[in-house]
Amino acid sequence: MSEPRFVCLSLGSNLGNRFKNLQIARTLLGEQAVLGLRSSVILETEALLLPGSPPEWDLPYFNSVLVGETTLSLRELLVTIKQIEKVVGRAEESPPWSPRTIDVDILLYGDESFCCDHTEITIPLSNLLSRPFLIALIASLCPYRRFCTQGSPYHNFTFGELAHHLPSPPGMIRRSLSPDTMLMGVVNVTNDSMSDGGMFLDPEKAVAQAEKLFTEGAAVIDFGAQATNPKVKQFLSVDQEWERLEPVLRLLKETWSNRKQYPIISLDTFYPEIILRAMDIYPIQWINDVSGGSQSMAEVARDCELSLVMNHSSSLPVDPKNILSFSVPIGEQLLSWGEKQLKMFSDVGLNANQVIFDPGIGFGKGAAQSLATLYEIAKFKRLGCPILIGHSRKSFLSLFGNHDPKDRDWETVGLSILLQQQGVDYLRVHNVAAHQKALSVAACEACAPI
């Protein structure tokens, strides 16, 4: 095995679920090619197109930069990258400059003076200086590394210097996004939600809200027609819940079916029948089951090949008196419950990679217990599945002040930063725009320069 060498890669995506595309590519690169992988933030940029390109190619990109070390030769690394691009879904014969599910480029390789000019690859990347957003991302990770290309007016400049001299033109960068923690945006098709009840009962308003959340940076959109807050004493029947959801899903099918960029669509329900009906209309991908995931729901997830969010709850409807023990650490109780659920799911044939763990903030927990749960993420990671936290605007935030639920976004964002630092995979939130701004800046701590 050869000695590890420095490597710097760029990831780009402007087709499909761009968050998931970057995430899958990054994971595979870390497993197969790059040691000690570190990621920049994600920058959404306008597409760079040649004059006369089809207008349907003009789709914004998500871009990020990865640095680390590799024991692969340049040729071996290139072959591995092509294989990973294929796994993520890139078409083999896509025209140059056309939209793509994933694009992985080798920007830098080896020591600073290493150069390569071959028909298959050029190091440093031949058009790197015309991609100022990539220069800025490299500078965020390794500002003191030098750009070495004989004959270039920028030869021997550090990337920090390059970023200073070659800033992105106005309008090129749309925004920055967190590279690690993805957001689930909430659309409550209810009249009795604590924070926005009645706002999105109309199907057009519900779909418009989903569009807004996606535009603001949600990787997942969670539609729910059944409120489960403590004030709800009786749930809707299957038919009543479906009466609210069906027109939303039909409008979603009408307006979103041919989209080139899209989020994961999730349904917040504990009725398996709702999922089966929904699958006949729109290809949802997640089930968000606040009951914790019954055997029948696990079987539906298995048969339909959907992801299942198992949300811990002590009772439904929520009973404030039915809460977890105060004498046993909250993390241990939730970990034990999660292990039992995963065992049951495994017994019915649901793969572990289809399960997402939600400790259920506010479900069967007092306010102090809910807050304590947010500090137990490392323990929950023992389950081996992604972690989702739904703390947005919930009543336990009254510990920080007696505010109306819709006015709890800043408390929510503050705790979301804490959760991102602990490696939470998904956050279920109402205010996506505020979260993306805060989390992308907070992510800079994890990608501090070396």
UniProtKB/Swiss-Prot annotation:
Pathway: Cofactor biosynthesis; tetrahydrofolate biosynthesis; 2-amino-4-hydroxy-6-hydroxymethyl-7,8-dihydropteridine diphosphate from 7,8-dihydroneopterin triphosphate: step 4/4; Cofactor biosynthesis; tetrahydrofolate biosynthesis; 7,8-dihydrofolate from 2-amino-4-hydroxy-6-hydroxymethyl-7,8-dihydropteridine diphosphate and 4-aminobenzoate: step 1/2
EC code(s) of this entry: 2.7.6.3, 2.5.1.15
Known cofactor(s): Mg(2+)
Domain Pterin-binding per the UniProt entry, residue ranges: 181-440
Record-listed Mg(2+) binding positions: 188
Catalytic activity: 6-hydroxymethyl-7,8-dihydropterin + ATP = (7,8-dihydropterin-6-yl)methyl diphosphate + AMP + H(+); (7,8-dihydropterin-6-yl)methyl diphosphate + 4-aminobenzoate = 7,8-dihydropteroate + diphosphate
Segments for region (DHPS): 183-450
UniProt: (7,8-dihydropterin-6-yl)methyl diphosphate binding residues: 228, 268, 288, 358, 394, 428-430
Keyword set includes ATP-binding: yes
Record-linked InterPro entries: DHP_synth-like (IPR045031), DHP_synth_dom (IPR006390), Dihydropteroate_synth-like_sf (IPR011005), Hppk (IPR000550), Hppk_sf (IPR035907), Pterin-binding_dom (IPR000489)
Superkingdom, natural source: Bacteria
Region annotation HPPK: where it falls in the sequence: 1-166
Record keywords, A-Z: ATP-binding, Folate biosynthesis, Kinase, Magnesium, Metal-binding, Multifunctional enzyme, Nucleotide-binding, Transferase
One term under GO cellular component: cytosol
GO terms for biological process, alphabetical: folic acid biosynthetic process; tetrahydrofolate biosynthetic process
CDD domains the record matches: DHPS, HPPK
Enzyme class: transferase
UniProt GO molecular function: 2-amino-4-hydroxy-6-hydroxymethyldihydropteridine diphosphokinase activity; ATP binding; dihydropteroate synthase activity; kinase activity; metal ion binding
Family named by the database record: In the C-terminal section; belongs to the DHPS family.
PANTHER family, per database record: FOLATE SYNTHESIS PROTEINS, FOLIC ACID SYNTHESIS PROTEIN FOL1
Name assigned to this protein: Folate synthesis bifunctional protein
